[in-house]
Amino acid sequence: MKRKDILELLRDIKPYDKGTHMMWTDPYIAKQLLEAHLDPTIDAASRNRTNVRRTLDWIDNQKVNENNDLLDLGCGPGLYTTELSKRGYNVSGYDFSMNSINYAKKVAEDEGLNIKYECMDYLTMTNENEFDIIMMIYCDFGVLSLDERNELIKNIYRALRPGGVFIFDSLNSKFVDNLKVSKSWDISEGGFWQEKPYTCLSEWLHFEEIRGTLEQHIVIDEVNDYKLYRFWNHYFSLEDVKNMFEAHNFRKIEKFEGLLEDDDSVTFYKIKK
């Protein structure tokens, strides 16, 4: 890969431009992600266990009826679904990573829990009137483009029973206040991105016109082949969220601040059908 090729990749990026590869379906990276999910001390693929517990306790207070059929979108290896099942919920979990789903299924089997897991893209879900609570945690809602968000909201509305709620968290403007638009590079003999030696060029950008951010990584191997990973996210205000969900006939939108320990850049929302 020549210098001019790198510059071309980084030049004139448009909102929602995609990378060349997906992290979630790469077998090697999937193993690294699972390790990050399961490390209780860090906020990497999942939040640290203190904040997971605080979130679970809050969700537990949002019960809407005695059925409590709950769906976790982007459930990962089951950090939330496992505990919610133990607390008496009828739990289902969808995730795009087969590696995470297989791990979650094994945990449920070992602990004798009846949790329904599926490896799937939640943008294609077709459930109707099945759930009282649908949740989406770790700011996953914000990674979607505008069209994808609208598609997901339609799916969620259809899948919820009357009076059911959608619970999610998102970045807020305080995240942008602390965002450092920057570039960095790393040389590794083998690490997170691949087992063999590589150089990784990383960049963080702010796209104010879409209230979005981009984190991108160009991973270059020993023979100058490369993979480009792009991760978009968005930050929302209460007004943004109201506009999105009221357009799809949701009736009540509530926001909750201060749920996470030492992190005021994330807001939680409860949306009622």
Q: Predicted regions span which residues?
A:
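Conserved SAM-binding strand-loop segment of SAM-dependent methyltransferases
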Residues: E111-L123
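Conserved class I S-adenosyl-L-methionine
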Residues: K2-N65
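Conserved beta-strand signature within the Rossmann-like core of class I S-adenosyl-L-methionine
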Residues: G163-S170
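Conserved SAM-binding loop of SAM-dependent methyltransferases across substrates and taxa
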Residues: P77-R87
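A short acidic, Gly/Pro-enriched loop at the edge of an enzyme's catalytic core
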Residues: T126-I134
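Conserved SAM/SAH-binding beta-strand->alpha-helix loop
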Residues: S97-N99
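SAM-dependent methyltransferase
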Residues: S170-E239
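A short glycine-rich, Lys/Arg-flanked "PGG" loop and its adjoining helix->strand segment in the class I
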Residues: N150-P162
